[in-house]
Amino acid sequence: MGLGKTEWEDIQIKYGNMEAPPKQLTEDELFDLIKEAAEMATEAEKNEKLENASLKDLKDMEDDEDEDVLEQLRKKRIQQMKVEAELNKFGELKEISEPSYKSEVTECKGVMVVVHLFKNGIPQCQLVNQHLTILAKKFKATKFVKIRSEEAIHNYPDKNLPTILVYFNGDIVGQIITLRATGGDATTVNDIEWQLKQAHAIKSDLQEDPRITLARKKSQKSRYSKADSDESDNSDSDD
């Protein structure tokens, strides 16, 4: 039997004048295709289940799955859990006192520590506490603490508040002294986030200083407003 439905179609197909119609599957061939697709779907579902299985799930599968495969997945899952634990280690702005400064800050190893020296009654200190509370929840791999300035450093001048110190392995690796460089009372949480990123205290997605971004947007808005005004003036002149 030819590839076409008629002898004429067979000739045209032979000389490349037309394409052969798709082959009609027999009932057995169709059944085999459906069976193969079902087996592939089952295998994919099984692999996904193994990848997402908890340690308890993996233990429950011991009688049904290859032990070497389960052991590899178990090790992989434990490593994932360790990484997740490190990335979610903290998550809050914790107030500490002078006796605990050493253990909470200078003796803290392998972790970035952000320390806010503050004093009650200073509005900008309150502002920084608000911003750091937000950032602590966002960057849980970094330790955020606050301490009254008079407890951290005796006779520390109020004119230097708020002060943010960044520690790593007991050393100060970054600092923000007052909010003069970040806009004073207008300092935003993004401004603080950018400064902490510059000190490598956090892994932020910010690509540039928020003040530069804001200045550019204001400049663009000003240009658009001027262009609209000029266009309006020209329209009035035409009238």
Swiss-Prot record:
GO BP, sorted A to Z? asexual reproduction; protein folding
Compositional bias of kind Acidic residues: 230-239
Q: Which SUPFAM superfamilies match?
A: Thioredoxin-like
Region Disordered: which residues?
Answer: 42-64, 212-239
Give the range the annotation lists for the signal sequence: none
Q: Which UniProt keywords apply?
A: Coiled coil
- Gene3D superfamilies with a match to the protein in the record: Glutaredoxin
What Pfam family does this protein match (any one)? Phosducin
The record places domain Phosducin at 36-196
| Coiled-coil region(s) | 26-87
Q: Which GO terms describe its cellular component?
A: cytoplasm
Compositionally biased region (Basic and acidic residues):
42-59
CDD domains per the record?
Phd_like_VIAF
Q: What ranges does the record give for the region Thioredoxin fold, renumbered to this chain?
A: 90-239
Organism domain of life:
Eukaryota
The biased composition feature labelled Basic residues covers 214-224
In the record, the note on similarity to other proteins reads: Belongs to the phosducin family.
For this entry, the protein name equals Phosducin-like protein 2
Native source organism of the sequence: Dictyostelium discoideum (Social amoeba)
